[in-house]
């Protein structure tokens, strides 16, 4: 195997920020200026093609988001958390945070707003989920409200570190990725299937891939490495999937001494979640022979 070029880490961070704002993960809104101590309201969310974020919620009576009138902008904080689909252990893959203005839409204007909205990411008409459908369902339910959040920047915390991005940069990510297909939104079922495909490669294959990335023999990069202080011994000698998308897989390799998180990049952007298994199996088949040949 020959050395490979390290991919653009900032581009991957922007793709992750777009995924989170476009509908992935769980989102919560806080009207921090009205009552900072009030609990956040969990919302369904989706980013429109113009960069504004649609949110739908059923805020409890008496809370700031319930009493805020329609048509009046309210300063809010939006927090989105994406957890790994790893059973038995909670791993936070990424979080996004932004400050913006939320305006609740009057009842008669909701249908028009939803009908004229287009999601920022494509979705598969067969198995993919349109995040706007979830927003529409919550907004039309008992006590449901529909609003639009306008913002300029988003702060992202992910395995590659902390970064800040303009909304315009996130919207332009497809044009920045030369030759890449438009962003595809995978359904929760597809994401779960992709995680299972990563696990199916097996611990030996995943460890070989991790070693090859660390040694610069497979595309990717090491995000962090820290002592395994406080890690449950039952997790030692395991490699777990933190996240997976069309561009690569984020793995966490745990030993009794250290915890290493790294990104494995695919040679080409995948057309669908069903290609994750074959793509990672191919990388493992490249890395395994050299690992097994070592004394």
Describe the function of each predicted region.
Residues 1-69:
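An N-terminal domain-cap segment
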Residues 1-7, 37, 46-48, 84-98, ...:
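N-terminal short leaders/motifs
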Residues 24-27, 50-52, 73-75, 143-146, ...:
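Short, surface-exposed beta-edge/turn micro-motifs
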Residues 28-31, 79, 146-150:
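A structural signal for short, well-ordered beta-strand segments and their strand-loop junctions
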Residues 30-35, 81, 252-254:
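A generic structural motif
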Residues 46-48, 105, 254:
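Short beta-strand micro-motifs enriched in acidic
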Residues 51, 59-129, 137, 143-144, ...:
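Short, structured beta-strand-loop surface elements
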Residues 114-295:
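C-terminal edge-of-domain segments
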């Amino acid at each position: 195997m020959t050395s490979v070029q390290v991919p653009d880490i900032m581009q991957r961070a922007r793709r992750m920020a777009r995924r989170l704002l476009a509908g992935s993960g769980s989102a919560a809104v806080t009207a921090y200026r009205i009552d900072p101590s009030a609990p956040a309201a969990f919302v369904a969310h989706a980013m429109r093609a113009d960069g504004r974020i649609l949110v739908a919620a059923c805020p409890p009576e008496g809370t700031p988001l319930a009493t805020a009138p329609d048509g009046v902008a309210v300063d809010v904080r939006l927090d989105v958390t994406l957890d790994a689909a790893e059973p038995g252990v909670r791993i936070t893959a990424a979080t996004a945070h932004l400050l913006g203005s939320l305006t609740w839409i009057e009842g008669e204007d909701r249908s028009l707003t939803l009908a004229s909205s287009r999601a920022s990411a494509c979705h598969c008409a067969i198995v993919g989920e349109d995040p706007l459908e979830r927003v529409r369902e919550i907004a039309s339910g008992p006590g449901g409200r529909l609003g639009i959040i306008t913002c300029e920047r988003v702060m992202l915390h992910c395995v590659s570190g902390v970064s800040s991005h303009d909304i315009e940069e996130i919207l332009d990510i497809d044009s920045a990725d030369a030759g890449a297909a438009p962003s595809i939104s995978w359904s929760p079922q597809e994401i779960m299937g992709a995680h299972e495909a990563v696990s199916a490669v097996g611990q030996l294959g995943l460890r070989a891939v991790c070693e090859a990335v660390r040694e610069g023999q497979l595309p990717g990069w090491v995000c962090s490495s820290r002592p395994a202080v406080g890690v449950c011994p039952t997790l030692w000698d395991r490699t777990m999937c933190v996240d997976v998308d069309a561009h690569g897989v984020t793995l966490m390799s745990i030993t009794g001494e250290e915890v290493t998180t790294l990104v494995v990049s695919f040679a080409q952007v995948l057309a669908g979640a069903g290609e994750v298994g074959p793509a990672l199996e191919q990388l493992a088949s490249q890395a395994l022979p050299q690992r097994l040949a070592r004394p």
